[in-house]
Amino acid sequence: MHPAPRPKPSLALVPVLLALALALPLARPADAAEASAGRPVWAKSGVHLSAAYERMLREEIALGRVLPPGLLERWGLDVPAEDESFAEAPGDLLRAPRLGAERVATVGLATDAQLNDKTGDATCGSCGSRPLGQAETTIAAYGSFLLAGWNDTKGFCTGGPVQGYGWSTDGGATWVDGGDPPSPIPGGRFRGDPVHAVNRKTGSFYVCGLYEDPSNGANSGLALIRGHFAGGTFVVDANTRPRAGGSDFLDKEWLAVDSLSGNLYVTYSNFVGGWYSQIEFIRSTDNGASWSAPQVLSAPASYGNVQGSRPLVGPNGEVYVVWYDYGYPLSHERVRRSDDFGASFGSEQTICAFYENSYSGAPGYRRGWAPTLPGAAVDVSTGPHRGRLYVTWDEAVDFYDAPFPGSPTTVTENESNGFFASATPFTVGNRLRGGCASSSDVDLYRFSGLRGQTLFFAADSARDSTTFNMRLVCAADTSTLNNYRLLTFSQSRYPAFAFTLPADGTWYVRLNIASSGPYPATYRILTTWDTPTPGERARDHRDRFVAHSDDGTTWSTPVLLNDDDPWFDGIFPEVTVDGTGAAHAFWHDFRDDPGCGALSYEYMTSSGDGGDTWGANRRVSDAQSFWSINACGSANQGDYQGITSQGNDVYPCWADSRLGDPDPYAEADRFAHGAGCPPPVGVGGGSNVFAVFSLTNTGNVPGTFAWTVTDDNGWLDGATPSTSGSVTLAASAVQNVTATLRPSGDCWPAAVDTVRFTASDIFIPGRTYSCQTTVTCAPTTAVTPAAARLALAPPQPNPSSGRVRLAFTLSRPGPVRLALYSASGARVRLLAAGQLGAGVHEAGWDGRDDDGRRVAAGLYYARLEAEGRTLSRPVGLVR
């Protein structure tokens, strides 16, 4: 057992720290009970501010705003942001990364569209190397109109809003950068965490975000824009402020629109007095003109531990609010439900308990911790799972229980300052000791590891007044700072990180000081490998999961979304449910950089059976992203990304750094497919007739499908290319299947045969496309028994809970054997054996074996052996 890294303590926790030398999390009693007896309770004290709010406060401090020292320390604002302002070689900071053939453009689903127009934007040099990228995307859709938004950090340079938006009037083919969202009052500005929504009845769009009111400065409130499209332009109809911050910090707001009632619902994290968070809910029943008093939804026991809430509306006006509740060692996703349009809420329910990797974000993430906020969506389609709520999250293996050696060998840092070639070698399990003499003093260590090993490194001894930057670096390219592939980053007085190695090789630990002394700043780092515990859901340091519920109370067993190898990272899973009831989830994914796991694409998976089964993952974005690049300050992935859908169309919206500093992108993926059947046809007995079925991809992305052709009477005599098979169809492609049907001369066993064509979507499990047609047979005259052909008709009924009728025809007299067999091939019952004449014959099976015992429900096979051939039919038995 080992300690988790201690947090930046608040002033309120100082007495506790002095008494226990531990930073106790603000946890529920239940959480404390979940911790094993030997597991030390040593973790971060509550949740952190969102990326948008942290950036906002840093800017205010840079401009001279004075905040209480306790708040600065509470949020880690007493040290500079991690911007990698030094390098081994002069002038390399803004150089493009040397990725060579590894960073190649590929084809995702549909074509990516860049949403922002960088023309006229400030350059890195003119902005004093302040960050200029975009992140935290959101998108809403209504017909051909799309409205997207993003955090836009160019506002840190211009002094304008730190939030941008843009629109498309042609379904996402082209986009207009809308610039800065207008302020409700002069002098105010939007400050990020954008959320967009639309009323599906009226077509009104809504833009919500954090807002800086000139009357209270950095203590953020909320602002809301309502608008519509006219003449190819987004027109603002109203601009209001749902909530003022006052002395509180309002953070990570979210918006939902009820198209049934027209109500607006907003939730947010209220850091009361700027300190500890609670989830609050407000609503408007008059289209945003006025707002209710806040309802506190999170439990008092979770005070300080909650973040990332999202309101959602079901098809009957039911309101859900989900949020993240930090705990140690287990965190939780929570939910409450309202059945009176948000006037009141039922009791808090737990969606899941999970181990989280809160120490570091995905590779290239430049904040010293990681958010584990939920994604969520409700099925409002007319499909079979209408009303179902889906929630997604990131989850880690339980590396908290990885044992540090009791008496480890100590390795003392001795390399030349900041040079990888002379990095101090060590073996995982050793204890590292060193010290930094100044803010430019960089310590480097190197070790070897194998693919699939999960490490946990934690600095458990350091000066309380010193904040360290500690990161894991891949050995792929360490020649210049701008090419480093930064896999983890922890910024803390007691930094730590966990990571599953994606390849065999050498890896580096890099450590320097973020604060301004005192020097020398000494430290001790414990190192260990984690051994997976049986029963853990996650396979490595971060996987993506989903669960669903039809009422918010009873939840399904979580299902793994990503199908990559169990040693690649991924983060920020978001989910939507389209108009057919299919669910789609997507996230940042790092599987396509096998040597380091530092380069990312967006990936998606889909479910057509209500979230029980998810299809093979598909790449969404067209180009790789290198988040480690240090263009215009540090890249920032933010805390979330956006996705929405309507009809068969799905719109993922994300940010990536393919062009250097990150930009927002979106695409319109149409998953539209169908099965086509020919009209009914007639045929004479003993003759062939052809029926041409078709599988059509009317969408704009490739799809893979499996098809079958079946009939009731047994007239099906083959198909071209086959009666069952699979095919991958490009956009707008068609697969024809031509079936041959040949009834007997006397049209046995019925005059009309029903022929069915069914196609299953391989990438959207549970989604099928089917149609049927009929073939009517006219008996030919003077048909003799000899005109019959050997055939075994489909069992009737099938499946059956009792007696099954088995009919067959013989074209000539001869020996016959008809028996039932189990799926394993063992004989169950002999039904007929001996000489029979040509013509139609029938036998029955009563669900018993040769000894007269009832057999178990399951799949069996009727096998006819006659005329030197063997024919078989499946028989389903239910009890």
Where are these regions (language model features)?
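Residue-level detector of functionally pivotal "anchor" positions at catalytic/ligand-binding pockets or at interdomain
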Residues: 406-415, 419, 672-684, 773-795, ...
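C-terminal PAP-associated
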Residues: 33-407, 528-686, 698
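Terminal connector regions
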Residues: 745-777
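Surface-exposed binding patches on compact interaction domains or structured appendages
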Residues: 465-469, 700-735
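Surface-exposed, proline-anchored Ser/Thr-rich loop/turn motifs
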Residues: 784-813, 821-826, 857, 874-879
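Short glycine/proline/serine/threonine-rich loop/turn segments at secondary-structure transition edges
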Residues: 518, 597, 745-754, 851-858
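C-terminal tail/sorting-segment detector
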Residues: 853-879
